[in-house]
């Protein structure tokens, strides 16, 4: 399954550094489809490709905490939901939320739950972590979500 970027531009799912490609095409004025439809979310997860979603921020000790959910295939019959909470350490030219300081140093990669189905993982993310349908992105695009929501001036 290819990722449709608009104007008939298709990108193979094997493309790495998707956020670099998206930024390049966006700079060329190519309209991009950032958010995945429900079918793409379940299809990606069933095929072993991760999806992510930026959640509303919160504050801890007067510092903004960036929150995002990642859903990934843990093994052949299990899917992992991960809640990542990191301090907003971003700066112009540094928007890699994966590298930001973790809120909880004992869980640098977030808190994880495992489910035996894609539907179970998505239902938990929706009901407990308050994700929204239609707001999932492919892995690697969460940085763009972060920049656009919290620091559009960069």
Feature locations, PLM:
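Acidic, proline/glycine-rich low-complexity IDRs
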Residues: 2-4, 104-154
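Negatively charged, low-complexity tracts enriched in Asp/Glu with abundant Ser/Thr
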Residues: 2-66
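Long, C-terminal folded domains that constitute the functional core of proteins
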Residues: 24-25, 55, 95-97, 149-154
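A cross-kingdom feature marking charged/low-complexity
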Residues: 35, 64, 73-91, 145-154
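Short aromatic-glycine-(Arg/Gly/Cys) micro-motifs in beta-strand/loop hairpins
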Residues: 41-44, 50, 70-109, 139
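Intrinsically disordered, low-complexity boundary segments flanking structured domains
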Residues: 55-58, 67-70, 99-102, 122-123
């Amino acid at each position: 399954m290819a990722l449709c970027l608009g104007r008939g531009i298709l990108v193979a799912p094997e493309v790495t550094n998707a956020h670099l490609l998206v930024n390049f095409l966006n700079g060329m004025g190519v309209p991009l489809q950032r958010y995945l439809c429900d079918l793409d979310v379940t299809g990606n997860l069933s095929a072993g490709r991760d999806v992510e979603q930026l959640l509303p921020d919160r504050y801890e000790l007067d510092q903004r905490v960036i929150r995002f959910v990642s859903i990934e295939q843990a093994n052949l019959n299990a899917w992992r939901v991960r809640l990542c909470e990191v301090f907003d350490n971003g700066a112009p030219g540094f928007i890699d939320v994966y590298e930001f300081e973790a809120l909880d140093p004992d869980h640098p990669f977030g808190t994880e739950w495992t489910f035996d189905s894609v539907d179970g993982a998505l239902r938990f993310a929706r009901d407990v972590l308050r994700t929204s349908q239609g707001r999932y992105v492919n892995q690697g695009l969460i940085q763009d979500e972060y920049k656009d929501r919290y620091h559009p001036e960069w």
